[in-house]
From Swiss-Prot:
Matching HAMAP family: Phosphoglyc_kinase
Organism: Streptomyces avermitilis (strain ATCC 31267 / DSM 46492 / JCM 5070 / NBRC 14893 / NCIMB 12804 / NRRL 8165 / MA-4680)
The protein's assembly and partners: Monomer.
PROSITE patterns with a match to the protein in the record: PGLYCERATE_KINASE
Name listed for the protein in its UniProt record: Phosphoglycerate kinase
Family: Belongs to the phosphoglycerate kinase family.
Location in or out of the cell: Cytoplasm
Length: 403
């Protein structure tokens, strides 16, 4: 995989460089609530601009239906990129139409343009190779060189991620190069004990990675909504907690395999419960009760790990040499259910281990709960991508940069 350093050594002065970034930031009423993904691509964009490239930044945002939708415009992301760069950024109101061509043609060396949301064109996400290829051809007309730096999208077989690199000289940006190096530390010659903390709502999202980790990790800590399927598989009643009944047989099989492989699988011993889901808008007090994990009342749902589990998980992380954490331990967006996630994050900060926070909600939680991001070994920008890498899958966007 050729990297941006090799590209810069070859020289980019006056060249049009297409940077596939991941600017898929969360928006509330048109305002960005977490700009982590924009910050993550800054080193690549800055280095190219400073070397005299005409930088064309492209990304998706949300899931528009293959047609323009103002709710998913990249304009707020383009404006924020300009603020962070401290330089004006041109914005094109289409992806491959006249506006995009005008914006790119108007660039002077060292300047940056952002084109509109790639998913406003059905060709970006099409399952049809020819349709995707046709869109990739139109994107290729905007540039001389391709730099892949949208790690959050490398697991998608989309035109700008998979098909476009084949049409231009292609390189990995700083972010992708860093992410791949970090993930290698979690898959090759891992320093032990290797402890993995998994949370989040759905156990089905994490089954494939648990399957792989049962052969690699020394210890698995389970929290979040997915924990209740494990507790149910253990024979406990879970009240009205989030439950994926259809996954119980698989979870049972994994629990047996963990025992056989000598992998320590740690489940919550107590949980915070309530009769209703908290109000995340008003953050009104939820007044949860703490109960033992095997004593959840029939009319209540578990919404965070309890104080004894927090202590237990912190102790299980304390002696680790390598930690991967993906998914919150509870409904961290509400102060009454944030302590579990906070405790795991704090245990990572206190640890001497190489710590990796696996993107998505966990990365957002670290920022929202006020942790210093530099206190972690690495905060990934790709939740789904990092999980699929750890599952041992070939990621289309990385494969496209290899050849």
């Amino acid at each position: 995989m050729k990297t941006i350093d090799e590209l810069l050594a070859e020289g980019v002065d006056g060249k049009r460089v297409f940077v596939r970034a991941d600017l898929n930031v969360p928006l509330a009423d048109g305002l960005i609530t977490d700009d982590g993904r924009i910050r993550a691509v800054l080193p690549t964009v800055k280095a190219l601009a400073e070397a005299g490239a005409k930088v064309v930044v492209a990304s998706h945002l949300g899931r528009p239906k293959g047609a323009p939708d103002p709710a998913f415009s990249l304009l707020p992301a383009a404006e924020r990129l300009g603020e962070l760069l401290g330089a004006p950024v041109a914005f094109a109101q289409d992806t491959v139409g006249p506006a995009a061509h005008d914006a790119v043609n108007g660039l002077q060396p060292g300047q940056v343009a952002v084109i509109e949301n790639l998913r406003f064109n059905a060709g970006e996400t099409s399952k049809d190779d020819a349709e995707r290829g046709a869109f990739a051809d139109r994107l290729a007309a905007l540039a001389d060189i391709y730099v892949g730096d949208g790690f959050g999208a490398v697991h998608r077989k989309h035109a700008s991620v998979y098909d476009l690199p084949a049409r231009l000289p292609h390189y990995a940006g700083y972010l992708i190069a860093t992410e791949v190096n970090v993930l290698k530390k979690l898959t090759e010659d891992v320093k032990r004990p290797y402890v993995v903390a998994l949370g989040g709502a759905k156990v089905s999202d994490k089954l494939a990675v648990i399957d792989q980790l049962l052969g690699k990790a020394d210890r698995l800590l389970i929290g979040g909504g997915m924990a209740y399927t494990f507790l149910k598989a253990k024979g406990y009643e879970v009240g009205i907690s989030l439950l994926q009944e259809d996954q119980i047989p698989t979870v049972k099989e994994y629990m047996e395999r963990a025992e056989k492989n000598g992998v320590e699988l740690v489940l919550p011993v107590d949980v915070l419960v309530s009769t209703e889901f908290p109000d995340l808008k008003t953050k009104a007090p939820a007044n949860p009760t703490t109960v033992a994990a095997d004593a959840i009342p029939a009319d209540q749902e578990g919404l965070d790990i309890g104080p004894e589990t927090r202590k237990l998980y912190a102790s299980k992380l304390a002696d680790a040499a390598t930690v991967f954490w993906n998914g919150p331990m509870g409904v961290f967006e509400h102060p009454d259910y944030a302590e579990g996630t906070k405790a795991v994050a704090q245990a990572l900060v206190d640890s001497q281990a190489f710590t990796v926070v696996g993107g998505g909600d966990s990365a957002a939680a670290v920022r929202i709960l006020g942790f210093d991001e530099t206190a972690f070994g690495h905060i990934s920008t790709g939740g789904g991508a990092s999980l699929e890498y750890l599952e041992g899958k070939t990621l289309p966007g990385l494969a496209a940069l290899e050849d």
